[in-house]
Amino acid sequence: MSFVTTIRDYAETLNSISDSLGQNFTVRSFILETIVYIFTTCRSCLFYILSFQWIHDFTLLPIVLPEFSSALFREKFFLETPSKVFFDFLEISDLQQNKFLLGFFNSFFLSLPFSVIHILSLRRLLIQGRPAGVYTIGGYLIGQLVFLTCVVFGIRQVLVPWLTLEPFNYLLGIILLFRVIYSMTRENLIELKGWSNPRYTNFFLVSFVLAWCEQTSCFQYLGNITLSSNVTILESFSSTSSISTFFTHTSYLLGIAIGSVLFSLFWGWVFLQVKNLCIFYTPLFTSSFLQFFNKTSFVLALALSLTSIPFYSFEYLVTGPLGFVSQDSVFKNTLLDQTLIKDPGKGLTGLSSLERNFQYLDVDVSPFDRGEYLTVPEVPQNLSFEELNYRGEFDWTLRNLKVSGITDSRSGFFTLSKLFKKENKKSLDSQKQLSSQEISERNPLLSELPLVFRVDLATHYDILNRYRQFYDGNVEESDSDPLLQRPIETISDSSFPSSGEAPQPRVENTIESKIKNKYYSNPVYKNLLALDIDLFLKRQPKTFQVNADQEIDLYTKRKMLEYYTNSLNSYSQLPYFETFDSFFDGAKTFSNKVYNQQFKGTLRSVRRLFTVRNDFVSSSEKLESKTEKVLKFDQPLYQFAEKQPFSPYHEELAQKPEQVLPRAKIGGISFVNTPLYAGWDEHLRKFVITNKLLPRTFAGYKVKIEPQTLKNFTNYSVKQTTKIKFTRWPLSEEKLQLSKQDSSVPYVTLFKILDEKTKETFAENKYLSFPANFELVEFSESQNEKGTTEKLKKPTLVPNRGGFVWPGNSKFKLPLLSN
């Protein structure tokens, strides 16, 4: 198997080089590349033997052999290795792969003197002497290093029992801290002499245990800062073998250990110099300085210890140890429900008695994964972040809530639901246009589009009717038990509530404009708001910004890819596919649709000020006009730098002219923009859509779209009425027999017969344009059926998926080898 793999790789290498060089692939290049391949193969074999990787592979044979067998039955001639696909593919080089330096610099964040144990260590260093400080910080560093070792190497025998004690280990740390602080208040402010004091053992052990407990800090999220591409310092690194894994993580931990010691010594030296400067250059005596620092350290230690308590939720500290999960439904509509908040202004405002009976405001305080976002306009929504924090929005929201409450009290509809929720304000007139003065006074970063525009979503009643038609239509028509109808009716009413149960208050758009214009025309408020938004947007790296044209280009090609992949899904063969596609508008799962990870919440206020959608272009003419940039938190760049033009995150975009293969070098073959097949390329590790006319080097790196096709597709994507259908390649013989005008499926072939005379001349070469895996298989039928043995030739496509089974390659481009 290894010999066949070597020959296969050699043939693949020559094919790749021949595709890249084209006519420049000479005999000299062939000999040179052959020598390089032989040298690289010998080096890999020598490393494989000396690194004892063959022992590791031999021990995995009982696991690998069943995978080989099952892969043959599934016709998947490669092993699924998710770790290699998901971790190695996007792994970025960390400090030139020097894990020792990476650990050394990451230790700087672990050594910052902001935690309680660092403050106590500095207190013992400056008051009780250097030995006391060394033993205290030494126990903490060793305990921290042991904990990191257990996490990085995955020593579950130690970690799992300890982590199952949460939150008792956190409470143990709090108790130890208060005990240490209490004992320090009763100590004399004298320096301990020598390095063999028996109290040093207590200092070391207490610090070691505190390193394993929760450490409070001024910046709770500072521990996640790392110079690598990993999420935290505790992340491990991928390696090719067990020996490489051991040495890689050992060097990383060694760098953390040495860096922690050096940076801790540095901070100790800095505070000793500060002590000397305060004593020699200030009127403070030594005793006064020690008393001042002693009191300050106690206050800081107590403050940091108490700040960790509200950092954790009540369920983590109390309900979690009792067996309740996060956001347990048992606590719904109780005092422990996190989605309800008391009205802080109850009893302090001039509202009526009926309004004061509203116990809770309609404020979105639900966790990030439990909120209701992107609902239709008629569904009542919670107050967003912008409506509560920006003064211009909050004043209008507060007035609208008062008007809504007074109107509800006059209507006489007093139900139990009003005790918990208020009706939201009525939707504003989406067709209203602002004056040019209001637009000119906004932030330059804001969109110049109308401040209010309608989002192209299905209306409330269309969704309700469609839901009842497809889901509970059969139940309503049947004479089943009402108990069976009640759950479905409950789901329908809760998912699509009607807005006509109570009269809605009348909202005057002119009053809203006056209230908001009072703030947005104020230069102080306008500059502060613009500064807040600009500082937020400037937190992103400038080298990763994209312009508006690139946003539209990305969105258009993503929509085309979405339609193409939806046409290849298995449910397209269902008998009721048209109904399925009409109801779900394509794929059923949200992950198969085009979306931007850009916000948390509804952004009802921000949508009026920024452009947050890419599909706002309603005509092809707007593509040629000036477009606005989309507000989003991730700004992926096409290309990283001039020296590194390729970006693995958006390889589908058109590259620079000098990086695109000229048309003349392809031998006069015209490009066919319609993709013929799509699939995962195991060698390039990416999803490739190509038509077999591009060389392998450029396959998947360029998606060229004609201007007319782009305009037509833009109109289709906006209207959402015309679906672009694709079909798989190859087409059936029945489809090919029909002309392009008579065929219901548009198609483009790799070759075109000019006339009947040409068809007769080239009849024997009709299979030359098929791919390399096309074969003519000879078989013989039995004599019982035909009476004579007759050999026939039928075309077939053999599996060509790469991996461990090699189906062969096409002919080399080198004339010496192709002959």
Curated annotation (Swiss-Prot):
Membrane-related topology note: Multi-pass membrane protein
Signal peptide positions (record): none
Keyword line: Chloroplast, Membrane, Plastid, Transmembrane, Transmembrane helix
Cellular component GO terms, alphabetical: chloroplast membrane
Superkingdom, taxonomy of origin: Eukaryota
KW Kinase (keyword) present: no
Name used for this protein in its record: Uncharacterized membrane protein ycf78
Natural source organism: Chlorella vulgaris
Biological classification of the source: Eukaryota, Viridiplantae, Chlorophyta, core chlorophytes, Trebouxiophyceae
